[in-house]
Amino acid sequence: MKKKIIIANWKLNGNIQLLQTLLKPLVNFYIRHKNKSSIKLVIMPPYVYLYPMKSIISHSSILLGSQNVDINLIGAFTGEVSINMLKDVGVSYVLVGHSERRQYHRENDVIIAKKFKIVKDSHLIPVLCIGETEHEYLSCKTEKICKFQIDAIFDLLGPSGFNNSVIAYEPKWAIGTNTIPSINFIQKILMFIQNYIFNKQNSTIKLFSLQYGGSVNEHNIIELYDVKNIDGFLVGSASLSLDFFKKLLNNC
């Protein structure tokens, strides 16, 4: 059975104390839990906690992820972090294209595609966030928006662009609102994404994983867990709670 990938995006949250009160108990709970074989956990803390987190999770199969990366490898780029630095501290997954990066940091599809490429070139796994605004959702433009965001990767990397990658469908209007699309709608969009990539790569071999993100919590993740085509979840604020992980592991 293919493992579901649960990615915990801590965003601008956390402190040293949280590593002790959340992460250490989570590691112990995960190690001894019977369902750990069906779930792959990836935690993405703020940059400053990557290295201390590495030592805490080192004796478990929990993986380290980064919320961002710069497109440059070295040089006079104050405040940035390169892919080689992330590799150096043990990062396996890198998030690119999150709607908050698109909105607040003016990242466009060209920049996002470059970040995606540099992650792949370094043999790490990129996690591409795609999704529509509420206006686009109400205007029935979800598929069109997802297509544009996917095409930016194919334009730069070609037909094999999404091999060994994760695509997280995360509608912007669902983030932090406690509102999610209907299960039927999520299934429809994930099927569209899958078939669109199959068509572009001229193959129906699924070498990528599809996730849902946006207001995922300890209640709705159980309902969504077995939805067709969902290979995992991108989780925000709920992943700051040990109870979320306990419920997930106890029920999935």
From Swiss-Prot:
Pfam families: TIM. Its EC number is 5.3.1.1. Signal peptide: none annotated. The active site is at 98 (electrophile), 170 (proton acceptor). Substrate binds at residues 9-11, 176, 215. Belongs to the triosephosphate isomerase family. This is Triosephosphate isomerase. The gene is tpiA.
